[in-house]
Amino acid sequence: AVREFLKWCGEEYVFCTWGNQDVMELQRNMKYYGMLSLLPGPVTYYDVQKIYGICHEEAGGRRSLEFAIDQMGIPKAQDFHRALTDARYTGDIFKTLEPAAVCVNSSIDVYQNPKNKKEEIFISYPTYDQYVSREFADKEKVMKDREVASTRCPVCHMPAKRRIRWFMNNSRAYESVSFCQK
């Protein structure tokens, strides 16, 4: 089924999801069936829930799909939490979003991390920067790499001063809080 789906997608496609779990689950299933090579990663996609929050919520919060449908006045013709119905509703919300907000707010799923320095990803979003580094064998090697451990202001791109040291927010990502010295 996944081969047919990817064939249907064609060469130039982008995934749009409600939330940040679907692309990872797709890759997990593909790995289980020995097909992960059909979808090279890291995978760039549009998290419609995130973009909806940026456009319609003060703090860019994450709301349920049903909340967004209600807020946008889209008729509820079918039950939620069914794959095709949720996909249709997500598409309906996506159509209401400002194209400018969509274009600058892509997401990156890192189920498949970059394998070397050349594959690393740096993206500057309107309010923050994201750096997806290559894999490291252990934490000590990561923290000794000056480029990986550095932080920059997303506005002026100058080095930022760290206010809160690097910490792990889950089992796969480190974060820090820094501020611009300008």
Task: Give the residues covered by each predicted segment.
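Metal-dependent phosphoesterase core characteristic of DEDDh/y 3'-5' exonuclease domains
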Residues: 6-135
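Acidic two-metal-ion nuclease catalytic site recognized across multiple nuclease folds
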Residues: 96-182
